[in-house]
Every structure is written in structure tokens, then in C-alpha cells.
UniProtKB/Swiss-Prot annotation:
Pfam families: F-box-like, SPRY. It is found in: Synapse. Required in the presynaptic motoneuron to down-regulate the levels of wnd and restrain synaptic terminal growth at the neuromuscular junction (NMJ). SMART domains: SPRY. Residues 61-253 form the B30.2/SPRY domain. Residues 3-51 form the F-box domain. One of its GO terms (cellular component) is pole plasm. This is F-box/SPRY domain-containing protein 1. Component of an E3 ubiquitin ligase complex composed of hiw and Fsn. CDD domains: F-box_FBXO45 (cd22111), SPRY_Fbox (cd12907). The lineage of its organism: Eukaryota, Metazoa, Ecdysozoa, Arthropoda, Hexapoda. Belongs to the FBXO45/Fsn family. It comes from Drosophila erecta (Fruit fly). Keywords: Neurogenesis, Synapse, Ubl conjugation pathway. GO terms for biological process: negative regulation of gene expression; negative regulation of synaptic assembly at neuromuscular junction; neuromuscular synaptic transmission; positive regulation of protein catabolic process; proteasome-mediated ubiquitin-dependent protein catabolic process; protein ubiquitination; synapse assembly involved in innervation.
Length: 255
């Protein structure tokens, strides 16, 4: 009978205690009893606010980059899903805001980066915002850990092997295993990507599909038959000093 004990705990006391716990411990605490579950289920509570303000870079909190994640808890989750500084080309670095990659101006090189967390189960969506010039090739999509993150020349690195799947925003082509898989989206005179637009990437690990959405318009399924492997948000770029941000949103909303 934990509930009666929990009920005796002052709200402020719980708030202080939970503020000092690690995020993994908070997840365990939410399973202790209904009172603690409801307490932590408030994604804008002072507990999540405290963790958000103490873990997220101030640069990210001050910008409108996280406008699509409205609560402290979802902002925190997005941060832990952002680009990995340890899983990117040597010509790429992650900016102080934690969400934006910067490609250094290295000649005759194509460079890629993966997110910190990959997915093998469930449905997931994230936003990609290309905040600099696209250059001759700019690809967004997914890859396994086996996919290369750097190569010589200016090429569509993402989608160049059997471990990656990508959409080249410059030519509106789908790429996988080194082959052009068709035009995308399947529209007559499909508009080209404009720098700064937010594209939502939708990975469905249950149906094994990858889809995209732009300006809240579903563009259709891009890839089917994805493998039963852990798949990571990935981009590859060729333009010097270009920047790309990625914000994890969670489970996609149907409709």
C-alpha cells in the first residue's frame, strides 16, 4: 500500500526530491504508485522545468527551434535524441545549442551525421530544418550504424549503400543502395525544398515504412520493406558552412 504513504508527502517535498533524481530514476518513480505517476505525468511541472533548464543549452531554449515541442518534458526528450557529436563525419561538429550540425568548408568531401538514438520498434517522427544552402546534393533520411558518414567528392552519401535510405532535396529523388528509387513526392511539378522549411520524417517500425511531411501535408510513403534493424535519423551534406537542425517529436499524430 504505497498510495497512502505517497499521499502524505507534501507536493513541494516531492518536487524537491524529484528535481535531484536522474531522468532514468524519474521513469522508475512514475511506476511506483498512481500519485507519483500523475505527479510526473504533468509535462510542464516544475520538476520537468528544472531538469529542462538545467540540461538544455540556453541557446536552444531562447530560439524558436523547439517551437514544435511545447512542454518541458518533450523539449528534454528532443535534446537526448538530437545529433550525436560522436557519430558524425570529422568535418561536422554540433553547435552549442545541441540540435544543429555545422559542416566545415572542406573541399571534395561529403559528410553525414546520425542522431543519438535509433529505433527498431514503434512509430517515430522528427523535424529536419536545413538552415543553410543545399549545394548540389542534400539528403535526409535514415541509416543503420553500418552506413558510412564521410566519402570523397560531392555525392549522395545517404542512400549510396544498402544501409541507408534518403530523399535528395535538390533533385526530389529517393535513394537507396546506390540507385535512384524514383521521384518524390509523386506530384506534377513538385515544389523544391526552400531553406528553413521544416520537414517531418515519419518512421514506422511496425509497418517498416519511411514517409515525409512538409508544411503539414503528408507527402506519401517514400520507402517500404525497411529491415528489422535499429535505424537512426541521418542527413548528408556537401555545402561548406551549411547547417542542419533536427528535433525529435515523439509518436506521430494520425490524421
Amino acid at each position: 500500500m504505497v498510495d497512502p504513504v505517497a499521499a502524505l508527502c507534501n507536493y513541494n517535498v516531492l518536487e524537491v526530491i524529484f528535481s535531484y533524481l536522474e531522468l532514468e530514476d524519474l521513469s522508475h518513480c512514475s511506476q511506483v504508485c498512481k500519485s507519483w505517476y500523475h505527479f510526473l505525468n504533468d509535462e510542464n511541472s516544475d520538476v520537468w522545468r528544472w531538469h529542462c533548464l538545467n540540461k538544455l543549452p540556453k541557446e536552444a531554449l531562447k530560439s524558436d527551434l523547439l517551437s514544435s515541442v511545447s512542454t518541458y518534458k518533450t523539449k528534454l526528450r528532443a535534446y537526448f535524441h538530437a545529433w550525436s557529436p560522436n557519430d558524425c563525419s570529422r568535418n561536422v561538429y554540433i553547435k552549442p545549442n545541441g540540435f544543429t550540425l555545422h559542416r566545415n568548408p572542406v573541399a571534395q568531401s561529403t559528410d553525414a551525421a546520425r542522431g543519438k538514438i535509433g529505433f527498431r520498434h514503434g512509430r517515430h517522427t522528427w523535424e529536419v530544418i536545413w538552415e543553410g544552402p543545399l549545394g548540389t546534393v542534400a539528403v535526409i533520411g535514415i541509416s543503420t550504424k553500418e552506413a558510412a558518414l564521410q566519402c570523397h567528392g560531392y555525392v549522395a552519401l545517404l542512400g549510396s549503400d544498402d544501409q541507408s535510405w534518403g530523399w535528395n532535396l535538390v533533385e526530389n529523388h529517393l535513394l537507396h543502395n546506390g540507385d535512384m528509387q524514383g521521384s518524390y513526392p509523386l506530384l506534377n511539378n513538385a515544389p523544391k525544398y526552400q531553406v528553413g522549411e521544416r520537414i517531418r520524417v515519419i518512421l514506422d517500425c511496425e509497418d517498416n515504412t519511411l514517409s515525409f511531411e512538409k508544411n503539414y501535408e503528408f507527402l506519401g510513403v517514400a520507402f517500404r520493406g525497411l529491415p528489422d534493424k535499429k535505424l537512426y535519423p541521418t542527413v548528408s551534406a556537401v555545402y561548406g558552412n551549411t547547417e542542419v537542425s533536427m528535433v525529435y517529436l515523439g509518436t506521430p499524430l494520425d490524421g
